[in-house]
Structure formats: C-alpha cells, structure tokens
From Swiss-Prot:
This is Large ribosomal subunit protein uL18. Part of the 50S ribosomal subunit; part of the 5S rRNA/L5/L18/L25 subcomplex. Contacts the 5S and 23S rRNAs. The gene is rplR. One of its GO terms (biological process) is translation. CDD domains: Ribosomal_L18_L5e. The lineage of its organism: Bacteria, Pseudomonadati, Pseudomonadota, Alphaproteobacteria, Maricaulales. Keywords: Ribonucleoprotein, Ribosomal protein, RNA-binding, rRNA-binding. InterPro entries: Ribosomal_uL18_bac-type (IPR004389), Ribosomal_uL18_bac/euk (IPR005484). This is one of the proteins that bind and probably mediate the attachment of the 5S RNA into the large ribosomal subunit, where it forms part of the central protuberance.
Length: 120
C-alpha cells in the first residue's frame, strides 16, 4: 500500500506532465505550501530560470499581514506575485498547483493572482 507522501509525489508528477503538454511556451506559476508559509514563483521552463517569486516570509508580506499562514497571507502572496509578474511583462501563465488540492490557501493565492492581472 502506498503512503500518503508517495501518493502526493505521484499526483504532483502527473500534474506537471499534464502542464508541460498544454503550456505552449508559457511560464508556469508554481505554488508550494508548507504548514506555516506559502511560496509562489513564476518559472520559465524554456530557459530554466525563475522570473519572479514571492512568499509569506518576505518583509513586504509580513508588514501588511504579520506572521501568518492563513488564506489572507496566501491572497497577499498572490497579489505580490501578480504585481511583480506584470512589471516583468508576464501576463499569461500556466498554474502549477504542485499536487495540492485546489482549495483553501492554494485557491486564495490563485484568485488573488488572477485579480492582479495574471491569465490562467
């Protein structure tokens, strides 16, 4: 029987393979969430480089929200990543939820990024 971790890793791999199939050269918005923080980065897979990144650990996020790991912090990270991406000229991305269920903090980050000007 597979462990929960093995299932999670396989789900993430399945998700990334599917994303690469439909990406068509668009960078991907990758999300990682730990128990206390949430991180997002936009990665250009063609060059293998991170274009922009944001997390709930940054000073900009902690000044506005304080330390936190709730959906409000995720919304703030979504707004930050969208603002930075638009500055860099990135508007169309593919959302890589990294095997996480599209619910809670991941959903809050995605919706805030959409409101900030990212299309996915």
């Amino acid at each position: 029987m597979k462990t929960q971790r093995e299932k999670s890793v396989r789900r993430a791999q399945r998700n990334r393979i599917r994303l690469r199939k439909f990406a068509n050269g668009r960078p991907r918005l990758s999300v990682y969430r730990s128990s206390k923080n949430i991180y997002a980065q936009i990665i250009d897979d063609a060059s293998g480089k991170t274009v922009v990144a944001a997390s709930s650990l940054e000073e900009a996020a902690q000044k506005e929200h304080g330390k936190g790991w709730d959906t409000k912090a995720a919304e703030l990270v979504g707004k930050l990543i969208a603002e930075r991406a638009v500055k860099e000229g990135v508007k169309d991305v593919v959302f890589d939820r990294g095997g996480y269920i599209f619910h809670g903090r991941v959903k809050a980050l995605a919706e805030a990024a959409r409101e900030g000007g990212l299309n996915f």
